[in-house]
Regions:
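Active-site lid/adjacent beta-loop-alpha segment flanking the redox-cofactor pocket in flavoenzymes
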Residues: 131, 136-153, 181-182, 201-206
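C-terminal helical "tail/cap" subdomain of flavin- and related membrane-associated enzymes
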Residues: 206, 221-324
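A short coil-to-beta-strand element that immediately follows conserved catalytic motifs
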Residues: 82-84, 101-105, 126, 149, ...
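Short helix-loop capping/hinge motifs at secondary-structure junctions, enriched
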Residues: 94-101, 138, 225-226
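Short beta-strand or tight-loop elements
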Residues: 31, 43, 112-114, 173
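Active-site substrate-recognition segment that forms the wall
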Residues: 104-139, 148, 155-156
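Conserved mid-domain beta->alpha element of the FAD-binding
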Residues: 61-62, 88, 118, 151, ...
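Conserved N-terminal helical subregion
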Residues: 1-93, 136-152, 291-312, 323
Length: 324
C-alpha cells in the first residue's frame, strides 16, 4: 500500500459484470449466440451467428478470448501457441477444505514443472484453486484416471497442503495453457480486438482481466474522441495499448520460466531473487502497477455518451436480407 497506494485485491467479476450489463438499457445480452462470421461494409458491420441470426452495428469489437473467431477471420494467424502445460481449476466452499490455508491472501506454490495458485472469493466463503503441470503432450484429451495419475506423479514431492488442494480439483475442468506472440495491429476498418483476443498471455503475472479492463477504457476514450471515425479510433487505441500489453505477454513468459525452473537454472533464479529486497521487488513491478497513461481525450458527459451509444447500438436483422 505505501508504494502503490492501493492494496492487492481479488474481485469476483462475473456477477458484478452481469448485473451491470442488465442494468444498462443500451446493452442487449444474447446468450448462446456463437458468431460464425462478420462482414465489414465500410459504413457498418454485419455479424452472423451459427443459429442464422444477423446483427448490424456501427463497429465490431471482438472480445472473444484466446480462441477468437473474430481474430481468425481478421488475421488468419493460426492457433494459440501451447507451452506444454495443462491447467485444472475448481471453486470449492472454504469449509470443505480442512487443511490450513490463509483465507485473505493470494498464495502461490511452485516447483519444477508445476505450480498451484489459490485465493479466497466472496468474503472468504469460497476457495479458487488453479493447479498447473507440464505434460508430455499438448493435447487436452485424456480420461480423468490418466490425468489423476499424471498429477500425482508431477506433485509427488510436493508439500502436503498442495496435495490436499489437488484432491479438491475437478479434473474435467482442464485447459491447455498457451499464449500468442505479440502483434502491433489489432484492427482492420471497423473491426477490432480486445483482451485475450488481441493479446493472450500466460497467467504468471495475473494480468489478463486487468489488461482487458484497461483496453476497454482506452477504447471507449478513443471512440469518443474520434467523432464517428472508427478506423481512426481503433488505430489510436492499438497504438496506445500495444507496447504495454506486449510487455505483459513477454514478462509473463519470463516469470513462468522462473516458476517452473529446475536444476542449476533454478538455483540461479533463487540467487537473483535473493539479492532483491522488498523495495527492489516493488520497483521492478512499478511499470505494471503504477498504472497506464490513458490517451489525453475529453470524455463526454454521460448524457452525451448515452446518446452516442444509442446511435451505435447493434440491431438484429433478417439474415436473408442483410448485406454480404
Amino acid at each position: 500500500v505505501p508504494r502503490f497506494k492501493y492494496p492487492y485485491i481479488v474481485i469476483h467479476l462475473h456477477d458484478a459484470m452481469l448485473d451491470a450489463c442488465r442494468r444498462e438499457p443500451l446493452i442487449t445480452l444474447e446468450p448462446d449466440a456463437m458468431v460464425s462470421r462478420f462482414v465489414d461494409h465500410s459504413d457498418l458491420v454485419s455479424v452472423m451467428t451459427e443459429d442464422g441470426h444477423c446483427f448490424e452495428g456501427a463497429a465490431l469489437v471482438g472480445a472473444d478470448g484466446i480462441r477468437s473467431r473474430t481474430r481468425a477471420q481478421l488475421f488468419a494467424d493460426g492457433n494459440p501457441h501451447p507451452n506444454g502445460f495443462m491447467a485444472f481449476r475448481n471453486i470449492v466452499p472454504m469449509g470443505d477444505f480442512t487443511a490450513k490455508v490463509q483465507h485473505d491472501v493470494v498464495t502461490l506454490w511452485a516447483g519444477p514443472g508445476f505450480h498451484i495458485v489459490h485465493y479466497p472469493l466472496r468474503h472468504g466463503t469460497l476457495l479458487n484453486i488453479v493447479a498447473v503441470f507440464r505434460r508430455s503432450t499438448n493435447s487436452e484429451r485424456g480420461d480423468v484416471t490418466a490425468y489423476h495419475a499424471e498429477l500425482e506423479h508431477a506433485y509427488r514431492d510436493a508439500h502436503p497442503i498442495m496435495k490436499a488442494l489437488l484432491a479438491m480439483l475437478d479434473l474435467s475442468r482442464r485447459q491447455a495453457v498457451g499464449d500468442r506472440d505479440p502483434i502491433r495491429h489489432w484492427h482492420k476498418g471497423r473491426v477490432a480486438l480486445l483482451g485475450d483476443a488481441a493479446h493472450p498471455t500466460l497467467q504468471s503475472l495475473a494480468q489478463g482481466a486487468s489488461m482487458a479492463i484497461e483496453d476497454g477504457l482506452c477504447l471507449a476514450d478513443c471512440i469518443a474522441a474520434a467523432n464517428g471515425d472508427y478506423d481512426a479510433a481503433f488505430g489510436s487505441y492499438e497504438n496506445a495499448r500495444a507496447l504495454r500489453t506486449a510487455r505483459v505477454t513477454l514478462e509473463s513468459r519470463y516469470i513462468w520460466d522462473i516458476y517452473h525452473s529446475d536444476g542449476i537454472t533454478r538455483e540461479v533464479h533463487w540467487q537473483m531473487l535473493g539479492e532483491r529486497g522488498e523495495a527492489d521487488t516493488f520497483e521492478r513491478l512499478a511499470w505494471l502497477y503504477d498504472g497506464f497513461a490513458f490517451p489525453a481525450v475529453e470524455r463526454p458527459a454521460r448524457s452525451q455518451s448515452k446518446q452516442f451509444a444509442a446511435q451505435c447500438a447493434p440491431s438484429q436483422v433478417d439474415a436473408k436480407s442483410s448485406k454480404t
